[in-house]
Amino acid sequence: MKNITVIGGGVLGSQIAFQTSYSGKKCTVYVMDDKCKMELITKLDALKDNYIMAIKDMADKKDWCRGISDYDTFDKDKCLEMVQKGYDNIVIETDLSKAVSEADLVIESITEDFNIKRNFYEKLSKLLPEKTIVVTNSSTMLPSKLCKYTGRENMFLALHFANSIWKNNVVEVMKHSKTDDKYFKMVMEFGKEINMIPLPIEKEKSGYLLNSMLIPFLFSSLDLLVNGISDVESIDKAWKYGTGAPEGPFEILDKVGLVTAYNIVEMYVKIPSFLAPYNFKGISKMLKVYIDKGKTGKSSGEGFYKYCD
């Protein structure tokens, strides 16, 4: 698959686009309007700097980013050239029909809201070429819940990336009962072609592999905060210094984005308090306060922490 369209220019959408273009694919990103386009350009500028910095660190053997290059084939100058070409070749489009007109693969990476996704897929289904495979990067929604809105159930599946994909280069490939094995294998191969490690998921599971482990961890951390057990910094330190992990849960939440976290929590707020394993209602209210103040995470300059340019 050569022509790839990414839908959405958020945290992961921008990363998927950059990695895809870096790997030599023709990549188009669809965003809703010029404001979103400018926000995406800012993200792509930052990603370019991140890749360049990572390559220099790799050359000095300080760190390794498997999404950029294997250890045995690493060539600093070649990788830097690929970064510039990848950056230059990304096309940003605000017309959906133009964005998908030649797509072999469409990767949807929009807000974790079922109604928004459903409405988008209903619109998309009327515009797609017959050849196009469609995947969702949804963190939590099962492809079987969305497939009927795509108009191509057998060509639809999930392709879920981890954050900082140039470094954390795993991608989860999950089919549903109507996914044709031919397209499942094609998406697995695409993962390899953009230097990811594709992890096959043969049976649907909300949260896939990574988030089935990550989301309860983040819920536990938010629960400690909202119930007044401890503060953000102390909870992060407990995890980092206690396990040797590079990031604490609230640093992870700021990278993921508090809007995404809020939308996931909202799926659980109707669980009766006496049955809920966490204080979902309290967590939802707390996150809403941050979001209403514009503190949506690292991309906005502030979430649980403040970030300098």
Predicted segments with their positions:
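NAD(P)+-binding Rossmann beta1-loop-alpha1 motif at the extreme N-terminus of oxidoreductases
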Residues: 1-71, 127
